Amino acid sequence: MKFNKISLSVSTALLAAGLAVSGSANAKGRLVVYCSATNILCETTTKAFGEKYDVKTSFIRNGSGSTFAKVEAEKNNPQADVWFGGTFDPQAQAAELGLIEPYKSKHIDEIVERFREPAKTKGHYVSSIYMGILGFGVNTERLAKLGIKEVPKCWKDLTDPRLKGEVQIADPQSAGTAYTALATFVQLWGEKEAFDFLKELHPNVSQYTKSGITPSRNSARGEATIGVGFLHDYALEKRNGAPLELVVPCEGTGYELGGVSILKGARNIDNAKLFVDWALSKEGQELAWKQGDSLQILTNTTAEQSPTAFDPNKLKLINYDFEKYGATEQRKALIEKWVQEVKLAK
């Protein structure tokens, strides 16, 4: 496949809560966004959309798993219009449960063909706005202090006893990043071998974080030697000066598709459709790396990629099965098994 300052008026309290508002007092309606991307991308995206279309736009930021739980809890009284960012699977699961409104964007034909398929398969409930490569980042300075000379290159290198308490990965109950990792291991090796690996990895994990982004920040600061997650988060930390080496594991790896969808019962449906169109457009996607400090691979074929974006054609990627691993029962079963056999196991 080929991939060819206006200030935001918002109170400190709202920013601390992860909610921002943009648009004029006489705006053409409203839009409430549940956002599972980074806080800066959430803020940049909603601000730019609100200013371009004169829509009073607000967002609440949470991880994909937490947002899914919120959307499900609010199904009889939806509090938002759009779900933007984060991994595709939870949004696909929400669609399966009737929590997402189908919408085929006018920009769908500009999206990389293979990335249109999840949307088509699910009935155009969720559209793909970016791709993120799963891997890990290694703090080389902290690794050297452990007396380890060679940077780990494979998933199974992370089970090295010398790395006890030195690895961080998110919790799949709250973070779509971690569920993507879990589903990737199962697709790489089969369920039994995948869970054997996770059990062997467990003593080396210092923390299962709530957010998938946190391990990148903690490894960048030297609070962990290795963080598992999407490599664009680690690329940003490295660009900012962190002593990180980014690793695409030797066995192969999976990837996320960042999703955007309209919530069932959206009160501002026309603005929600407009937002999805904009998020899939060249302009909306390029905003991610030009202003939003997000270095994912963009899915719009007309969009300019970040100079640091990976070329997926050169990576050893699995054929990630979004249909199977985005299904409600499959996702629920894998997460429950992980909780019982890994996280809570003695």
Curated annotation (Swiss-Prot):
Q: Which GO terms describe its cellular component?
A: outer membrane-bounded periplasmic space
Q: Which GO terms describe its molecular function?
A: thiamine binding; thiamine pyrophosphate binding
> What GO terms describe the biological role, i.e. biological process, of this protein?
thiamine transport
Work out whether the entry's keyword set contains Signal: yes
Q: Which UniProt key words apply to this protein?
A: Signal
Q: Which residues form the signal peptide?
A: 1-27
Q: Does the keyword Protein transport apply?
A: no
UniProt superkingdom: Bacteria
For this protein, the record's PANTHER family field holds:
ABC TRANSPORTER SUBSTRATE-BINDING PROTEIN (PTHR30006:SF2), THIAMINE-BINDING PERIPLASMIC PROTEIN-RELATED (PTHR30006)
Report the protein name in the record.
Uncharacterized protein HI_0131
| Record organism | Haemophilus influenzae (strain ATCC 51907 / DSM 11121 / KW20 / Rd)
